[in-house]
C-alpha cells in the first residue's frame, strides 16, 4: 500500500483505526476488536468497470481479468473480484447495514453481469439490497461524478422495522436543485503562486499546451481538448468553467483551470 496515502489519511482522521492490509487477508476479527459495527461502508476498486478507463458500453471490457499495476509497485489480478472480498468480510461481520460504491459503468453493457452477481451475493449473505446511480453534483459537490451506490439492510432488521424491499429505494437521498459552481467553492481560497507557477511551467512543456491555447479563455461551459486538436487527441483534458461544477476528476487529472494553463493545486 502507498505509504504516503496511508499517512495522509491518518493525518486527516487521527482517531480512525487504519488496517493497511490486503482485504483478502482480513477477517471479521480484525474489525471486531474495535467494537460492534452497525454500518459497514466500502468502495472496492472499480477501474475494470470504469467508462473513463477500459470499459466500453455494449462490449467486453478489456480491463476484466487483467493485472492492475499500482504506484507502490504491487500488482493485483482480477481487481473486479475485490467487491466479493468486501462482501465476504461483510458476511462474517453481519452489520445491520452495508453501503457500497462503484462506478456507473457497472450498470451498462456486459458489466451488468457483474452487477447481477453482486446483487445475488448480497441476497445470499442475508441482505435486502437496492442500488441507484447518484451524481455528486446533486448533493452539494462542485463536481459531476456519477457513482452506483448500494444500500443493503440485514433481513432480520428489515422485518423488525417493517422495511420492505421496495422501500429500501426510498432510503436514497433526494436530489438538490441547487448547483455549486467552481467559483462558489474556490473564490475565497488563496492560491499558492509558487506551486501554481511551477505547474504552469511544467504544463507548457507538454503537447497539451498548444491545444489549451486554442481553447476559449474563461469559458461559459466545460471545454474538451479533443474538440480543439486536429486529430481529436487530448480528449481527457478539459478546461473547466468557473460558472459550472468541475467535470469528473479522474486519477490521471485532466481538469484544468479556466484561465491558467495548469491543473488545480
Mark where each language-model region is.
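Flexible, glycine-/basic-rich loop-and-beta segments that form/coincide
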Residues: 140-207
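Core alpha/beta nucleotide-donor-binding catalytic domains of modification enzymes
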Residues: 1-94, 104-108, 113
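Bulky hydrophobic/aromatic "packing anchor" residues in well-ordered structure
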Residues: 134, 186, 249-250
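Short, solvent-exposed loop/turn segments at secondary-structure junctions
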Residues: 3, 45-47, 104-105, 137-139, ...
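C-terminal target-recognition/interaction regions appended to catalytic cores
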Residues: 200-265
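Short alpha-helical segments and helix-capping/turn motifs at coil-helix boundaries
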Residues: 23-28, 134-137, 232-234
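Conserved Class I SAM-dependent methyltransferase catalytic core
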Residues: 71-153
Amino acid at each position: 500500500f502507498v505509504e504516503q496515502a496511508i499517512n495522509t489519511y491518518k493525518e486527516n482522521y487521527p482517531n480512525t483505526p487504519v488496517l493497511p492490509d490486503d482485504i483478502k487477508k482480513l477477517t471479521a476479527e480484525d474489525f471486531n476488536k474495535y467494537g460492534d459495527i452497525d454500518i459497514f461502508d466500502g468502495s472496492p476498486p472499480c477501474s475494470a468497470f470504469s467508462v473513463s478507463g477500459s470499459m466500453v458500453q455494449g462490449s467486453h471490457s478489456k480491463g476484466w481479468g487483467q493485472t492492475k499495476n499500482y504506484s507502490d509497485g504491487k500488482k493485483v489480478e482480477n481487481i473486479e473480484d475485490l467487491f466479493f472480498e468486501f462482501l465476504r468480510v461483510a458476511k462474517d461481520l453481519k452489520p445491520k447495514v452495508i453501503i457500497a460504491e462503484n462506478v456507473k459503468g457497472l450498470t451498462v453493457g456486459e458489466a451488468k453481469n457483474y452487477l447481477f452477481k453482486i446483487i445475488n451475493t448480497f441476497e445470499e449473505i442475508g441482505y435486502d439490497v437496492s442500488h441507484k446511480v447518484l451524481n455528486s453534483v446533486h448533493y452539494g459537490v462542485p463536481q459531476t461524478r456519477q457513482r452506483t451506490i448500494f444500500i443493503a439492510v440485514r433481513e432480520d432488521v428489515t422485518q423488525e422495522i417493517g422495511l420492505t424491499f421496495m422501500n429500501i429505494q426510498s432510503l436514497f437521498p433526494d436530489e438538490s436543485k441547487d448547483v455549486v459552481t467552481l467559483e462558489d467553492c474556490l473564490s475565497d481560497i488563496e492560491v499558492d503562486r509558487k506551486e501554481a507557477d511551477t505547474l504552469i511551467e511544467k504544463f507548457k512543456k507538454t503537447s497539451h499546451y498548444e491545444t489549451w491555447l486554442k481553447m476559449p479563455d474563461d469559458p461559459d461551459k466545460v471545454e474538451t481538448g479533443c474538440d480543439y486538436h486536429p486529430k481529436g487527441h487530448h480528449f481527457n483534458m478539459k478546461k473547466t468553467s468557473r460558472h459550472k461544477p468541475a467535470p469528473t476528476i479522474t486519477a490521471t487529472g485532466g481538469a484544468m483551470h479556466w484561465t491558467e494553463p495548469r491543473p488545480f493545486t
